[in-house]
UniProtKB/Swiss-Prot annotation:
Top EC class, one word: isomerase
Cellular localisation: Cytoplasm
Phylogenetic placement of the source organism: Bacteria, Bacillati, Bacillota, Bacilli, Lactobacillales
Protein name: Triosephosphate isomerase
Biological process according to GO: gluconeogenesis; glyceraldehyde-3-phosphate biosynthetic process; glycerol catabolic process; glycolytic process
GO molecular function: triose-phosphate isomerase activity
Length: 251
């Protein structure tokens, strides 16, 4: 049985004071860790405040990005080694905004996955197609290829433990949501791709999230689908009441 995982992705929002206030507002009401995993992904400048406020709670912490080298002359980048030393649990990689605005390639993202595992953290690996790709009937092929490239060289144990987030680009921040059936269809393709690359045991263990305008009103239906184990949530994760509604989708 795969444990549900609801992760907020704050993108470039919130400051350290707001971060502390947010965690203080939710920490007494989080679901038990053995029921649902609650995660917040925050900008690098907020991570110390988030880690401090989350101490002793069931809240896990994600960085929104890191570099694939541990140290060196890489101005402006974040070291995976340092993130691990700080106590970060997850790192989001391959988000469409990183691929699109910052021209990250499949190879870059694969190197990051290796660096994250090397430093004892877990990647939340994002994949997803554009509206153009979907309308051309190539969504399944596109996403399967992203997963294939992103997992290159990773062991079966590593893939079993990671999180893959399917985020159709046309549904991120647009108010458009893939229907629960559309989301399930591609999440099933992700799982089938993992089964082909590794085996069914690995595919049955990997947790797959759907991301793209997930909110309290639709989370229960989305989470009811066979191959969807969680949500990667933007806007709806930035209000304490809304985030609590999301992590308590099962109540």
């Amino acid at each position: 049985m795969r444990k549900p995982i609801i992760a907020g992705n704050w993108k470039m929002n919130m400051n350290p004071t707001q971060t502390t206030e947010f965690v203080n507002a939710i920490k007494a009401n989080l679901p038990k860790f053995d029921q649902t995993e609650s995660v917040i992904g925050a900008p690098a400048v907020d991570l110390p405040a988030l880690l401090e406020a989350a101490k002793g709670t069931d809240l896990k912490v994600a960085a929104e990005n890191c570099y694939f080298e541990e140290a060196g002359a890489f101005t402006g980048e974040t070291s995976p080694k340092t993130l691990n030393e700080m106590g970060v649990d997850y790192v989001i990689i391959g988000h469409s905004e990183r691929r699109d605005y910052f021209h990250e390639t499949d190879e870059d993202i694969n190197k990051k996955a290796h660096a994250i595992f090397k430093n004892n953290m877990t990647p939340i690996f994002c994949c997803g197609e554009s509206l153009e790709t979907r309308e051309a009937g190539k969504a399944e092929e596109w996403v399967s290829n992203q997963v294939t490239e992103g997992l290159k060289g990773l062991s079966a144990d590593q893939v079993s433990s990671m999180v893959i987030a399917y985020e159709p680009i046309w549904a991120i921040g647009t108010g458009k949501t893939a229907s629960a059936d559309q989301a399930q269809e591609i999440c099933a393709v992700v799982r089938q791709t993992v089964a082909k690359l590794y085996d069914q045991t690995v595919a049955d263990k990997v947790r797959i999230q759907y991301g793209g305008s997930v909110k309290p009103a639709n989370v229960k239906e989305i989470m009811g689908k066979e191959d969807i184990d969680g949500g990667l949530v933007g806007g709806a994760s930035m209000e304490p009441a809304s985030f609590l509604d999301l992590v308590h989708f099962n109540d």
